[in-house]
Amino acid sequence: MDSSAQVIIANLTSPPVLAFALGLLAVLVKGDLRLPDPIYQGLSIYLLLGIGIKGGVSLRQSELSDVAIPALATIILGLLIPVLAFFFTGKLTKLSEVDRGALAAHYGSTSLVTFTAALVFLEQSSIQYEGFVTTLLALLEIPGIIVGLMLGSRHLKRDVSWGESLQEIFSSRSILLLVGGLVLGFATGTVGYAKIEPFFGALFIGMLTLFLLEMGTLAGRRMRDVKSAGAGLIVFAIAFPIGSGILGVVFGYASGLSMGGAAVLGVLAASASYIAAPAAVRLALPEANPGIYLAASLGITFPFNLTIGIPLIVLVAQSLEGMVG
C-alpha cells in the first residue's frame, strides 16, 4: 500500500472520524444519538478553551519574528479567500449576491473542529508543526466574515447593521474562548499548564471524539438540504476547499512555516465556519438562505474535510516540501 493511501486510511480509521461517521449513520437510519445540549455546549467550551490555552503556552515560547510573517500571510489569506469564494459561486451557481456573500463569509472564516482534527491527525502521524498555529486560527476567523458580508450587502437597498454584526462576531463564544485561552496560556506558561495538562491534554482526543459524534448527527440533518442545493453548489463545496487548501499551503511555505505548519494553514484555508459566520450572517444578511450556506458548509464541506480533505492537504504539503526545501 502506498504512503498516500496509508495517510488517508489512518485518518478514516481514527476514533474521532469514526465517531463522526457513527453520528451520520444514526441520522440515516433515523436513530437518536444526539448528546444533551448542556453536554454539547460543555464540550465546545472545553475544546475552544483547551486549544486556546495550549496555543498561548506555545506562543509564549515563540519569537515575535517567527510569528509576524505567518500572521501577515494569514490575514492576507483571510481577505483573499472570501473574494475568491464570491467569484466562483458566481461562475458555478445562479445564486443571488446576498447568498454568495453569505457563502463567502462562511468559507472565508474557519472551522475550529476541522482545525482540531488536523492537529490530532498530525500528532498521530508524528508530524511537527509550529505551536503558534492557534494564533493563525484566531486571525483567520474574522476578516473573511467581514469581507463576505461586505460583498453580499453591496447592492442592498437598506443599511446593514454593521455595529451589531461586528459586536456579534467579536463577542461570540468561539472568539472569546479562543482568544481568552490564548491569553491564559500565554500568561501561565509551561509551569501553569503542567497543572491542568491531565485535563486539557490526556482527555482531549476522547472529548473530541464525543463532540464529533454530535457533529455527525448535525451534519447528517443538513445533508437533507444538499439535494436541493444544486450541482453547482455541491461542486463548489468540494472543489473550492481543495483549491483554497492548496493556496493556504503555498502561503504557509512562503511565510516560512514548516511542512506541518503549512499543512495546518492549508486546512484552515480549506475549512468553512458553521458557528461564528452563521450568527453574523443572520444579523447582517437576513435575506440569505440558511439552507444554502449551512448545507454547503456543514452538510458537504465539513464531512469532506474531516474524512478526505485533511489527509489530502497534508499530502500536498509533503509533496511541495521537496520543491521548496
Tell where the protein language model's regions lie, with residue ranges:
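An N-terminal, globular interaction/scaffold subdomain
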Residues: 46-47, 51-76
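Fold-independent oxyanion-binding glycine-rich loops
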Residues: 51, 215, 236
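Membrane-interface helix-loop junction between the first two transmembrane segments
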Residues: 25-45, 60-61
